[in-house]
UniProtKB/Swiss-Prot annotation:
<comment type="function">
    <text>Core subunit of the mitochondrial membrane respiratory chain NADH dehydrogenase (Complex I) which catalyzes electron transfer from NADH through the respiratory chain, using ubiquinone as an electron acceptor. Essential for the catalytic activity and assembly of complex I.</text>
</comment>
<feature type="transmembrane region" description="Helical">
    <location>
        <begin position="92"/>
        <end position="112"/>
    </location>
</feature>
<keyword id="KW-0520">NAD</keyword>
<dbReference type="InterPro" id="IPR003918">
    <property type="entry name" value="NADH_UbQ_OxRdtase"/>
</dbReference>
<keyword id="KW-0812">Transmembrane</keyword>
<keyword id="KW-0999">Mitochondrion inner membrane</keyword>
<feature type="transmembrane region" description="Helical">
    <location>
        <begin position="391"/>
        <end position="411"/>
    </location>
</feature>
<dbReference type="GO" id="GO:0008137">
    <property type="term" value="F:NADH dehydrogenase (ubiquinone) activity"/>
</dbReference>
<dbReference type="Pfam" id="PF00361">
    <property type="entry name" value="Proton_antipo_M"/>
</dbReference>
<feature type="transmembrane region" description="Helical">
    <location>
        <begin position="194"/>
        <end position="214"/>
    </location>
</feature>
<dbReference type="Pfam" id="PF01059">
    <property type="entry name" value="Oxidored_q5_N"/>
</dbReference>
<feature type="transmembrane region" description="Helical">
    <location>
        <begin position="60"/>
        <end position="80"/>
    </location>
</feature>
<keyword id="KW-0249">Electron transport</keyword>
<keyword id="KW-1278">Translocase</keyword>
<keyword id="KW-1133">Transmembrane helix</keyword>
<dbReference type="InterPro" id="IPR000260">
    <property type="entry name" value="NADH4_N"/>
</dbReference>
<dbReference type="GO" id="GO:0032981">
    <property type="term" value="P:mitochondrial respiratory chain complex I assembly"/>
</dbReference>
Length: 459
């Protein structure tokens, strides 16, 4: 594990010793090297667990998420170049250091064996994200967004700490590898339902569950591009990862407690998809679409069947790459037009034909077009929920329909139609941007050929 963590720590001297004209190329190439070094982790052993040490391990659930995290750092650095050009060198270095801190915390979160260590690192990811949003965001509302983000996450995860300390006292260990072999049943503890709620609530806020999702659109809209990318692609997956880890341990309570949450998610995903149809703000639309996709993941995790687990992990990885790509595209529009309103960005296909191709591909992956892994994930979840209750097919089917509607609405609003007169002198698309989009798209296409490496624990 140290072969990933130590190179990530060594990014700091690379950042601080680079001079102004080399800082981008140095950090991008170095972080790409780290992501290539992580690739062997995807090849899992027979017993499905690489126990590196007492502190860190990886299995087929954490290694795809780990890979997603390290793959995203070079992409975030590439996406941030344009809007940091006017900043002084010191601020550029600070910004890159924050991204590196975030990457380091995330790597350790996904591989921690001990639940308290996981909790500490889970909370530590909050600090760099908050600094990125409140320092480099575009509008003054970013402080409000940062406050929302901070309080929702902190208040959600305090009960988790209390519950973890209680479990530690009553059972003596919080190690994942030991907890799976528990002889004592959790339902014999004081009030297992409250314990379950306390453990799961932190991840529900992070996912976010419909009703606790109000921090997400605010944070996404106000964050700079790298903040939006890492928030959509990795930080939401932390919630899913924590839920997958804990619900397995908290059985059989999950089977009783899951009903209201499954109902809320099935209702919430239709609601948030419908909100997407009414959005004028491009980033806000993508943020709400994240909420509706993550609701499907919560449904899958709470159903506790092998198929739904496979669907949840596949959907998490697919959504990470897709939503990150959509935010990059929205940002490339914003850098040219200086507005997030879709009405002001009409008819861009005539000016940027290659960008229109990327827009089409991103919209199609977002609406789960076959053969992409988005569809594989969604189909697994829908089949699992259908066998749980036949009526869920109405909700999930309606959700797929509305998703297709707002994805195509987003595509036609930004690319087609009569262009507005203030975009005559916009810049062409740069090689950097096209490389960035292709590096989002390539993993999605490649995973289509071998989806089993992201199918998670049960495959």
């Amino acid at each position: 594990m140290l072969k990933i963590i130590i190179p990530t720590i060594m990014l700091f001297p690379v950042i601080w010793y680079s001079n102004g004209n080399m800082i981008w190329i140095n950090t991008t190439s170095y972080s790409l090297m780290i992501s290539l070094m992580t690739l062997p982790l995807l090849n899992q052993t027979e017993n499905n667990s690489n126990n590196f040490s007492l502190m860190f391990f990886s299995d087929s659930l954490s290694s795809p998420l780990l890979m997603l995290t390290v793959w995203l750092l070079p992409l975030m650095i590439m996406a941030s170049q344009h809007h940091l050009t006017k900043e002084p060198l010191m601020r550029k270095k600070l910004y890159l250091s924050m991204l590196t801190f975030l990457q380091m915390f995330l790597i350790m979160t996904f591989t921690a064996t001990e639940l308290i260590l996981f909790y500490i690192l889970f909370e530590a990811t909050l600090i760099p994200t908050l600094i990125i949003i409140t320092r480099w965001g575009n509008q003054t509302e970013r402080l409000n967004a940062g406050l929302y983000f901070l309080f929702y996450t902190l208040i959600g995860s305090l009960p988790l700490l209390v519950a973890l300390i209680y479990v530690q006292n009553s059972l003596g260990s919080l190690n994942y590898l030991v907890m799976n072999m528990w002889s004592q049943d959790t339902s014999s503890l004081w009030s297992s339902n409250l314990l379950w709620l306390a453990c799961i609530m932190a991840f529900m806020v992070k996912m976010p569950l419909y009703g606790l999702h109000l921090w997400l659109p605010k944070a996404h809209v106000e964050a700079p591009i790298a903040g939006s990318m890492v928030l959509a692609a990795v930080l939401l997956k932390l919630g899913g990862y924590g839920m997958l880890r804990l619900t397995m341990i908290l059985n059989p309570t999950t089977k009783i407690m899951a009903y209201p949450f499954i109902m809320l998610c099935l209702w919430g995903m239709i609601m948030t998809s419908s909100i997407c149809l009414r959005q004028t703000d491009l980033k806000s639309l993508i943020a709400y679409s994240s909420v509706s996709h993550m609701a499907l993941v919560i449904v899958a995790i709470l159903m506790q069947t092998p198929w739904s687990f496979m669907g949840a992990t596949a959907l998490m990885i697919a959504h990470g790459l897709t939503s990150s790509m959509l935010f990059c595209l929205a940002n490339s529009n914003y850098e040219r037009i200086h507005s997030r309103t879709m009405l002001l960005a009409r008819g861009l296909q005539a000016f940027l034909p290659l960008m229109a191709t990327w827009w089409l591909l991103a919209s199609l992956t977002n609406l789960a077009l076959p053969p992409f892994i988005n569809l594989i994930g969604e189909l697994f979840v829908i089949m699992a929920s259908f066998s749980w209750s036949n009526l869920t097919i109405i909700m999930t089917g309606l959700n797929m329909l509305i998703t297709a509607l707002y994805s195509l609405y987003m595509l036609t609003m930004t690319q087609r139609g009569k262009f507005t007169y203030h975009i005559y002198n916009i810049k062409p698309s740069y090689t950097r941007e096209n490389t960035l989009m292709s590096m989002h798209m390539l993993p999605l296409i490649m995973l289509t050929f071998n989806p089993k490496i992201i199918m998670g624990l049960t495959y």
